[in-house]
UniProtKB/Swiss-Prot annotation:
InterPro entries: Chalcone/stilbene_synt_C (IPR012328), Chalcone/stilbene_synt_N (IPR001099), Chalcone/stilbene_synthase_AS (IPR018088), Polyketide_synthase_type-III (IPR011141), Thiolase-like (IPR016039). One of its GO terms (biological process) is flavonoid biosynthetic process. Pathway: Secondary metabolite biosynthesis; flavonoid biosynthesis. Belongs to the thiolase-like superfamily. Chalcone/stilbene synthases family. Gene3D superfamilies: 3.40.47.10. It catalyses: (E)-4-coumaroyl-CoA + 3 malonyl-CoA + 3 H(+) = 2',4,4',6'-tetrahydroxychalcone + 3 CO2 + 4 CoA. CDD domains: CHS_like. Its EC number is 2.3.1.74. It comes from the Eukaryota. It comes from Sinapis alba. This is Chalcone synthase 1. Pfam families: Chal_sti_synt_C, Chal_sti_synt_N. Keywords: Acetylation, Acyltransferase, Flavonoid biosynthesis, Transferase.
Amino acid sequence: MVMGTPSSLDEIRKAQRADGPAGILAIGTANPANHVIQAEYPDYYFRITNSEHMTDLKEKFKRMCDKSTIRKRHMHLTEEFLKDNPNMCAYMAPSLDARQDIVVVEVPKLGKEAAVKAIKEWGQPKSKITHVVFCTTSGVDMPGADYQLTKLLGLRPSVKRLMMYQQGCFAGGTVLRLAKDLAENNRGARVLVVCSEITAVTFRGPSDTHLDSLVGQALFSDGAAALIVGSDADISAGEKPIFEMVSAAQTILPDSDGAIDGHLREVGLTFHLLKDVPGLISKNIEKSLDEAFKPLGISDWNSLFWIAHPGGPAILDDVEKKLGLKAEKMRATRHVLSEYGNMSSACVLFILDEMRRKSVEDGVATTGEGLEWGVLFGFGPGLTVETVVLHSVPV
């Protein structure tokens, strides 16, 4: 076998890599048609779970819903379905088969809806898609949701797929980090990223001994978001980045073991939350910012545009207070929380879409609310934090 010379290997490696940074070239979102109004949800939830006798707990749940700052949430689960599946309405009853039967079919379908919108905005033939990254915390199956999406969209059988299951709320940052690496290390790559989340795996009735589970029932919702990611946009073909990704990092916060846990059991996906999650995140967030922005010489956090996973209003409040952020910094984040709830991994991608939409509507100079540099944060089980440095583009 003839060994390649170092220079030719270097040339091959260079030829395989993109020249410029990865950019988000298109965004699409989708939600189930069925939705609930948060102010009405406590009455509905305690009625459908046959828990109206738990009057004190219902009052606590009402306060949770009031404090959530959520106006409405989309949910695939309808009242009719829940009436036919009473085990899903209990706090702990065997129900995994019924839950799996829903999500194995519906997660790829909802993902397809978002992907079709992203591909339409991108404006290129879907045959140009080289990679698929699919992320969900809703159910597991083989072949996975990545395979089902590839079939639903009619993508090439040679498309390179990556399936991420059971990551939780930080994973909107993870998919960006992975897509960035794929796009920048494979010249001409176009990565379809899809996060699709359906709460059929986590829905359950109330328990007065597990209030952390009730927090999830007040926050979680269904949604899917899709991106096309690629480097070296083909301007002549009509490609144009919406945001560019400059760097991406992941870290496990110190002293945070067990702060957020999820366990897939016969009863579905159980959710456990420690009270001090907002404190753990706000205490450690500046270190992540320092590490991410020191190379750029940026230390004024109000000079950035902000996209933060809206785990709940307490997290956003604590981060704002700790960093001295102006109230408008979290506008896009709080808007998505209000209108959609906590859609786990899909949230930050919805916020990207909301930010670019409002930037165009307001006539500001860039896709990042008129600012040049921004940060995207994902928070979730671990506690794991994803930090993505973004560069906006002119509107």
